[in-house]
Curated annotation (Swiss-Prot):
Enzyme's top EC category: transferase
CDD domains associated with the record: UBCc_UBE2Q
A GO MF term: ubiquitin conjugating enzyme activity
PROSITE patterns from the UniProt entry: UBC_2
Source superkingdom: Eukaryota
Keywords, in A-Z order: ATP-binding, Chromosomal rearrangement, Nucleotide-binding, Nucleus, Transferase, Ubl conjugation pathway
Subcellular location(s) per record: Nucleus
Gene (name only): UBE2QL1
Name of the protein in question: Ubiquitin-conjugating enzyme E2Q-like protein 1
Residues of the active site: 88
Intrachain disulfide bonds: none
Subunit: Interacts with FBXW7.
């Protein structure tokens, strides 16, 4: 897959990719950088978090349909990351997706959204150790898409997280 080769050539080590069970359709992506002026970057430094780990699952008809993308770890709050690690971004929906998008571009947009939405690493006792689940992420994503199809996609104020 050309996408994988392009990411391997990135000079800024923004992201790195590992195939899950050697499948080209299932990637774990490490996001190594967010805005260094953000509270999320500060959280990452304070908690010795080297990266945000995401999982991308690609449909058979990629790039004509978006991948399913979710956060695996660390557990995040706000930043448009919802239950199960689901991500609230219109470009990850069939309506918002374009076959011209690259994984790198999607990851850069996600990094910007995390910061814009005031994403933080969860430090609440008990909750911070609880893993995100794929089943919960899929259900949450389905629900948020249905809600946005009904009411539209708007950019909420930053204070809404």
């Amino acid at each position: 897959m050309k996408e994988l080769q392009d990411i391997a050539r990135l000079s800024d080590r923004f992201i790195s990719v590992e195939l899950v069970d050697e499948s080209l359709f299932d990637w774990n992506v490490k996001l190594h950088q967010v805005d260094k002026d953000s509270v999320l970057w500060q959280d990452m430094k304070e908690t010795n978090t080297e990266f945000i780990l995401l999982n991308l699952t690609f449909p058979d008809n990629f790039p004509f349909s978006p991948p399913f993308m979710r956060v695996l770890s660390p557990r995040l709050e706000n930043g448009y990351v919802l239950d199960g690690g689901a991500i609230c971004m219109e470009l990850l929906t069939p309506r918002g997706w374009s076959s011209a998008y690259t994984v790198e571009a999607v990851m850069r947009q996600f990094a910007a959204s995390l910061v814009k939405g005031q994403g933080r690493i969860c430090r609440k006792a008990g909750k911070s150790k609880k893993s995100f689940s794929r089943k919960e992420a899929e259900a949450t994503f389905k629900s948020l898409v249905k809600t946005h199809e009904k009411y539209g996609w708007v950019t909420p104020p930053v204070s809404d997280g």
